[in-house]
Amino acid sequence: MIKLIVGLGNPGAEYTATRHNAGFWLIDQLAREAGTTLRDERRFHGFYAKARLHGEEVHLLEPQTYMNRSGQSVVALAQFFKILPDQILVAHDELDLPPGTVKLKLGGGSGGHNGLKDITAHLSSQQYWRLRIGIGHPRDLISESARAGAKPDVANFVLKPPRREEQDVIDASIERALAVMPMVVKGELDRATMQLHRN
């Protein structure tokens, strides 16, 4: 059963619309659906709400520590409420999936994602769930001829807003993720994964 859903992103209005904040977009939608408001909670170093989602009590968190310090926020809340790593779902932007794709998985490496890297270090475990929201990779935007010599600027890419057509399909993928949340919060994660990966 998932007791904590974390969305990763960077704090500040200048980052709100950037690809790296896809995790925040999901949490904002969940809070709206639950009719709750995230509030600044200093002891958790983030914006926090306790929500009732599909009959289950769930904690929602958006760390306000900047991406590479996300673990500080996650572990503060997890320790306070005695939440185990496998009861945590972290929603994050995923370079290795195209826009419009969203996948669930338990455990694994960070894939170069600094937020995941820090969460793993703070929890001393990789065994937490991830909701991977595809944003694509900058190499996908480079022409074949230019690709040979070009090194894609990942840092610049994730800190820019998606193009309109990308935003539309990312929004649609978040809607699909929201549709499986009843299963997720009830602990039916295998079923949720199958449904999400079928779409």
Swiss-Prot record:
Entry GO MF terms: peptidyl-tRNA hydrolase activity; tRNA binding
Q: Which Pfam families match?
A: Pept_tRNA_hydro
Picking any one GO biological process from the record gives: protein quality control for misfolded or incompletely synthesized proteins
Q: Which UniProt keywords apply?
A: Cytoplasm, Hydrolase, RNA-binding, tRNA-binding
InterPro entries assigned = Pept_tRNA_hydro, Pept_tRNA_hydro_CS, Pept_tRNA_hydro_sf
What general EC class does the enzyme of this chain belong to?
hydrolase
Quickly give the catalysed reaction. an N-acyl-L-alpha-aminoacyl-tRNA + H2O = an N-acyl-L-amino acid + a tRNA + H(+)
Q: Say which family it is in.
A: Belongs to the PTH family.
Query: What does the UniProt record say this protein does?
Result: Hydrolyzes ribosome-free peptidyl-tRNAs (with 1 or more amino acids incorporated), which drop off the ribosome during protein synthesis, or as a result of ribosome stalling.
What is the name attached to this protein's record?
Peptidyl-tRNA hydrolase
Could you tell me which species this protein originates from?
A: Burkholderia cenocepacia (strain HI2424)
